[in-house]
Regions:
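Cytoplasmic helix-loop-helix junction between adjacent transmembrane helices
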Residues: 123-156
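Helix-loop-helix hairpin linking two adjacent transmembrane segments in secondary transporters
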Residues: 143, 152-200
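Intracellular juxtamembrane helix-capping segments at the cytosolic ends
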Residues: 131-144, 323-337
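Helix-to-loop junctions at the C-terminal end of transmembrane segments
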Residues: 78-90, 271-283, 365
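Extracytoplasmic gate region of multi-pass secondary transporters
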Residues: 47, 222-262
């Protein structure tokens, strides 16, 4: 029986199986991308939240770092649990549950000022946000062109976070850190509007037979990529969590720091746009090498005293290259993830890095000296990127595992 290519909303015929087609259209990609930032939003805003809980709630710098760490741990746990359900249950039902829980937990956070209850609530908020994040990553990874889909998602995320960072100094001044949590609650409630058009299930994936008809096993390489994701995100969030404090230690004004972080989100749009436009045109190794060099440059520049212009440049380049690299890293794992479950685990390892990184960074602060954080971030970034380059080299001849891509190629 000849395989049939599905039209939008129809089913694919593969052998004797009928498979519901996944919607790869740009409009659906943008819809998924609009929900994508909600999961890690608090972690991305952590520089402003850290400053807020220190200044408004009286937490120490170490306590603030542990708030970031425990929220990241909630995201990690949610991602690991999501690997068990993401291919089995309705995506729209889980998205509704995640959005409602995230909204309520952020409302509760806005009205707490005791450290231990605050930690517990932020852990739960990390779990609900992590469930949303894992779901959207799975949906984007099911696209025929995952590098491009993740690039689009990063563009949308950059635009949303640019607005959030630009508004954060005003919100902190008028309503303290609680205002930022109210903003996150409102965003979660707003995402419920996406439910009617959000995909209810993912795309079908198939294994390509190797010699003797057996499917090749890429498990070891996938785990290498997952560990590399952990190291890379430890580097990124270990430094990013304290970048606002790094700016203050350099003598920069609060408004200048907030503007720089807002500009960094605009720069992230540029980096994500580059990934979306380039897709796999230049391979995956070259963009990651570019990102590695740029990240190391920023970590060298933002040490000790520096000018506002240097801070604007460094924060912007850091975010642009972070989202560029993230798009290609997820594309690397999606390419060899036959069942589509490891890609969800990737968000867990990213979340683990975003949790462990701030915790390690907190332990490296020495009486207002943040330079050892830069050193840690540089080391983790270098090792993680080299591991990804190894995976890329070993899988350079591997094709897509998506069933619908196989159908198209066979027609």
């Amino acid at each position: 029986m000849r395989d049939r290519i599905p039209a939008r909303g129809q089913a694919a015929i593969i052998g004797n199986r009928t498979i519901k087609a996944f919607d790869h259209t740009l409009s659906t990609t943008f819809l998924i991308s609009a929900v994508y930032p909600l999961g890690p939003a608090a972690l991305i805003l952590m520089p402003m939240l850290v400053g807020g809980v220190i200044d408004d709630l009286g937490f120490s710098e170490q306590q603030a770092g542990y708030v970031a760490a425990v929220e990241g741990m909630g995201l990690v746990l949610a991602s690991w649990v999501a690997a068990l359900w993401v291919r089995k249950v309705s995506w729209t039902s889980m998205l509704a549950l995640g959005c409602i829980a995230t909204a309520l937990l952020n409302l509760l956070s806005a009205n707490l000022d005791e450290y231990v209850p605050f930690l517990v609530v932020r852990f739960l908020a990390g779990f609900s946000g992590g469930s949303i994040f894992a779901l959207t990553v799975a949906a984007l990874g099911d696209n025929r062109h995952p590098d491009r889909a993740f690039g689009v998602a990063q563009v949308v995320q950059g635009a949303m976070m640019f607005v959030a960072f630009a508004a954060a100094p005003y919100i902190l001044a008028q309503w303290t850190v609680g205002g930022l949590y109210y903003m996150l609650a409102a965003a979660a409630a707003l995402m419920l509007l996406a439910l009617p058009l959000f995909p209810s299930h993912g795309a079908q994936r198939i294994a390509v037979g190797g010699a003797g008809g057996d499917a090749p096993d890429y498990t070891a390489l996938i785990w290498t990529g997952l560990i590399a994701s952990f190291l890379f995100f430890s580097s990124i969030f270990g430094f990013w969590t304290y970048i606002e404090r790094v700016g203050q230690a350099a003598g920069l004004a609060t408004d200048s720091i907030g503007l720089a972080l807002g500009i960094s989100q605009f720069a992230a749009i540029v980096g994500a746009g580059a990934a979306a436009i380039a897709s796999n045109r230049y391979g995956r190794a070259a963009p990651l090498i570019l990102a590695l060099g740029g990240q190391l440059l920023v970590l060298w520049l933002l040490v000790g005293r520096f000018t506002p212009a240097t801070f604007y440049f460094g924060a912007g380049l850091f975010q642009a290259l972070f989202v560029l690299a993230n798009s290609y890293q997820l594309g690397v794992i999606s390419k060899i993830d036959v069942k589509g479950n490891f890609l969800v685990l990737a968000t867990g390892f990213q979340g683990l890095g975003s949790a462990v990184g701030p915790g390690i960074a907190a332990s490296l602060i020495d009486h207002g000296d943040y330079s050892r954080i830069n050193q840690m971030a540089a080391l983790f970034c270098l090792v993680g990127m080299l591991m990804f380059l190894f995976v890329i080299h070993r899988t350079r001849h591997v094709g897509s595992p998506l069933a619908e891509n196989r159908v198209s190629a066979a027609d």
